[in-house]
């Protein structure tokens, strides 16, 4: 399984977004996106809901991201 941080980065790049634009879309700080993508911290449940909604709106698969998040929470 790919790391959660790597999957978040790939998802953002699939959407052709900068960290700044992705942060605005999720209503989080750029620093938060940077910490997620560099495995400094993981998204909380509220952020995961925002990520899921973003994926659904942009036709980006969410299953692998969700599985990686659940695995890291255990």
Write out the residue ranges for each language-model feature.
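Secretory-pathway ectodomains
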Residues: 7-8, 27-28, 51-63
């Amino acid at each position: 399984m790919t790391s959660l941080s790597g999957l978040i980065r790939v998802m953002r790049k699939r959407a052709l977004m900068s960290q700044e634009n992705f942060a605005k879309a999720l209503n989080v700080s750029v620093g938060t996106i940077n910490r997620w993508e560099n495995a400094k911290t993981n998204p909380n449940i509220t952020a995961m809901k925002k990520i899921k909604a973003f994926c659904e709106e942009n036709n980006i698969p969410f299953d692998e991201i969700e599985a990686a998040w659940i695995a890291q929470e255990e």
